[in-house]
A protein has these predicted regions:
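Acetyl-CoA-dependent GNAT
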Residues: 3, 7-13, 18-32, 37-99, ...
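Short, solvent-exposed coil/turn linker segments
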Residues: 9, 108, 163-166
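Generic low-polarity alpha-helical segments
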Residues: 31, 50-51, 107, 144, ...
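Conserved glycine-rich acetyl-CoA-binding loop
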Residues: 93-111, 118-120, 130-137, 141-142
C-alpha cells in the first residue's frame, strides 16, 4: 500500500469534502442528528464548489493522505479561537476513511499536522473532539491532556478539549 501526505491543492477540494462527508456519517451516527448527516451527501457537490471558490494557497494548512493515488484522509490545522494559551495552534480536523483506520495513518497525519503547526510558529496545540467520538481515545494515546469540555456550537453538543503542552 503506497501512501503520500502532501499539501492540499485546489483540485483536492471535492475529494476532501467527500472524505469529510463519509467520515462524519461513519463516526457521528447516534451522536449528531441523522437528518444533518444525510444532508451532507445531498450538499456535497455544492460544499465542494464553495470551498474550491474560497481556496487560498497562502492560508492553506490542510494536508491530504493519498493511498494508492486516492485521497482517503486529511488533517487541517491552524490558529485557535481559544485565547487561554500562548503560542497555541489547533488541530481542527483529522479524518480518515474507516477502512484505512488502524493502519498507522492517523498517527502519520497527526504528526504531519504537528509539523505544519511548528512551521506556523506554534509550540503548543489543542484539539476538540465531540464526546462519544472514538477518536477521544486516540488523542489521549497521542499524549493529549483532557483540560475541559466545552460546547461545540454547530450542534450544541459537548466537546472534549485536549492540550498538548509541547509539540
Amino acid at each position: 500500500m503506497n501512501y503520500l501526505i502532501r499539501r492540499k491543492t485546489k483540485e483536492d477540494c471535492a475529494p476532501v469534502v467527500h472524505v469529510a462527508t463519509v467520515v462524519w456519517n461513519e463516526t457521528y451516527k447516534g451522536i449528531v442528528d441523522d437528518d444533518f448527516l444525510n444532508k451532507l451527501y445531498e450538499t456535497e457537490e455544492q460544499r465542494a464548489k464553495e470551498i474550491y471558490n474560497k481556496f487560498n494557497e497562502e492560508d492553506n494548512h490542510q494536508l491530504v493522505l493519498e493511498v494508492d493515488n486516492n485521497i482517503v484522509g486529511f488533517v487541517n490545522v491552524g490558529d485557535t479561537d481559544d485565547t487561554n494559551y500562548d503560542n497555541c495552534g489547533e488541530l481542527h480536523a483529522i479524518y480518515i476513511l474507516g477502512k484505512y483506520k488502524g493502519k498507522g495513518f492517523g498517527k502519520k497525519l497527526f504528526e504531519a499536522g504537528i509539523e505544519e503547526l511548528k512551521r506556523m510558529g506554534y509550540d503548543k496545540m489543542i484539539i476538540g473532539c465531540l464526546v462519544g467520538n472514538p477518536s477521544n481515545d486516540f488523542y489521549k494515546h497521542m499524549g493529549g491532556k483532557l483540560i475541559k469540555t466545552r460546547i461545540f456550537l454547530l450542534f450544541q453538543l459537548p466537546e472534549n478539549v485536549y492540550y498538548f503542552e509541547k509539540i
